[in-house]
């Protein structure tokens, strides 16, 4: 065995440095997220406003017969002044019973300002961004709220978003928290529940606390309508329209705040096939946004968003590549097909990285009522070897799809997540 460092050794060093840098950044974000969690414990958003702004709730829906009724009924039940609220469901080129269900809800609720915009393959069918554009052009509210068609927001969800936005003129949008409605369905939905809580308390809450940065999710958020008008609506080329609109709000000089007291419950994929399709689409959409906005990295005017560009670029390129390469090195090394000459206890480094991951997720679960228990900690320990490894495949697929579609010039389409 040679005493010098070979190609595999340098690859191994690249992997270890990249993984530990990301772990350290996430530790810092988790500390920020926990500090913000402590702040939320003291918040009071129940005092009524002197004057409530008008709100238009947009619900893009394409073949959503399984969930649309529950969603719209939850929106009707929101604790918000009835004369200040309009609900606009964009029935976008649906071929199922979505339209019939909406018509029945309208018939049963004549006093509710429920508007159904029905499009066909000519006037609609251009993805979620296109549906949202159709909705906001019809809206009359000062604020726009967006909920996915599978969501059931809690009664105070919208009110808490509005209260938060009203306190700061520099807020362009406020996002709430989304929870997993079907978290007990199977092992996959249990993993998704833990993942989404970790992301929201670490990445969203942590970035807001430390950098006043936060990206809009696809649901449970409000945005000032005048800003959407100024930006010309949603980007119809963007699959991750939520992340894309976030960066344009940044560029206008506005902030986006995370308000976890506003909660909505959504249905998550129940099969690995549906989950992989959904998540690879998300990765593809986020890579599009990063490429579109990467030039901001070199702009002094927008230096405040450099962390987001660096962080998400690191996730999809630096961390992804290092995690895949390290897995390959581990497998080949275990089979005695390769050797490396780096001195030191590398096994200890792997164990420490694993323990840090478990600790980060355990802290995130401790901030959510009813989630910090031995069963979930056990799931966290297991998901590192299962769910997280599947994510590597999904992320790689998403990056490849972006490259392929960019080369072929393919347009974004409405890929609706299958409902259960």
Where in the sequence are the language-model features?
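Juxtamembrane C-terminal module of membrane proteins
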Residues: 28-52, 295-312, 328-420
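N-terminal signal-anchor transmembrane helix
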Residues: 29-84
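Acidic donor-binding segment of Leloir-type glycosyltransferases
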Residues: 73-122
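Long helical/loop segments within the catalytic core of UDP-sugar-dependent glycosyltransferases
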Residues: 109-111, 115-142, 155-239, 280-291
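Acidic donor-binding loop at a coil-to-helix junction in glycosyltransferase catalytic cores
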Residues: 239-245
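Catalytic donor-sugar/metal-binding loop of nucleotide-sugar-dependent glycosyltransferases
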Residues: 246-264
């Amino acid at each position: 065995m040679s005493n010098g460092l070979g190609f595999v050794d340098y690859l191994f060093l690249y992997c270890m440095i990249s993984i530990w840098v990301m772990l350290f950044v996430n530790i810092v974000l988790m500390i920020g997220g926990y500090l913000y969690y402590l702040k939320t414990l003291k918040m009071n958003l129940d005092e009524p406003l002197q004057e409530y702004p008008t709100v238009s709730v947009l619900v893009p829906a394409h073949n959503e017969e399984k969930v649309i009724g529950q969603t719209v009924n939850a929106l009707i039940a929101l604790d918000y002044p009835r004369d200040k609220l309009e609900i606009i469901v964009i029935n976008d080129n649906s071929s199922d019973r979505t339209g019939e269900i909406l018509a029945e809800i309208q018939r049963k609720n004549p006093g509710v300002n429920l508007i159904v915009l029905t499009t066909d393959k000519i006037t609609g069918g251009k993805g979620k961004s296109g549906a949202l554009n159709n909705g906001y052009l019809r809206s009359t509210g000062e604020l726009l709220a967006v909920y996915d068609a599978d969501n059931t927001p809690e009664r105070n969800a919208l009110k808490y978003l509005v209260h938060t936005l009203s306190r700061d003129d520099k807020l362009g949008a406020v996002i709430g928290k989304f929870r997993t409605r079907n978290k007990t369905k199977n092992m996959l939905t249990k993993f998704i529940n833990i993942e989404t809580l970790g992301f929201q308390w670490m990445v969203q809450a942590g970035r807001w606390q430390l950098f006043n940065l936060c990206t809009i999710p696809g649901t449970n958020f409000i945005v000032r309508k005048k800003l959407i008008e100024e930006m010309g609506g949603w980007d119809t080329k963007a699959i991750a329209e939520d992340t894309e609109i976030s960066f344009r709000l940044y560029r206008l000089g506005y902030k986006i705040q995370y308000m976890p007291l506003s909660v909505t419950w959504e249905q998550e994929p129940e099969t690995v096939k549906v989950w992989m399709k959904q998540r690879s689409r998300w990765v593809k959409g986020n890579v599009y946004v990063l490429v579109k906005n990467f030039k901001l990295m070199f702009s002094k005017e927008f230096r405040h968003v450099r962390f987001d560009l660096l962080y998400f670029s690191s996730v999809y390129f630096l961390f992804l590549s290092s995690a895949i390469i390290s897995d390959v090195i581990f497998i080949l090394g275990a089979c005695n097909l390769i050797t490396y000459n780096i001195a030191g206890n590398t096994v200890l480094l792997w164990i420490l990285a694993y323990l840090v991951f478990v600790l980060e997720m355990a802290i995130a679960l401790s901030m959510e009522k009813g989630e910090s228990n031995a069963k979930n900690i056990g799931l966290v320990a297991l998901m590192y070897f299962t769910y997280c490894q599947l994510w590597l495949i999904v992320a790689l697929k998403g990056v490849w799809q972006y490259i392929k579609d960019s080369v072929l010039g393919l347009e974004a389409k409405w890929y609706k997540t299958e409902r259960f």
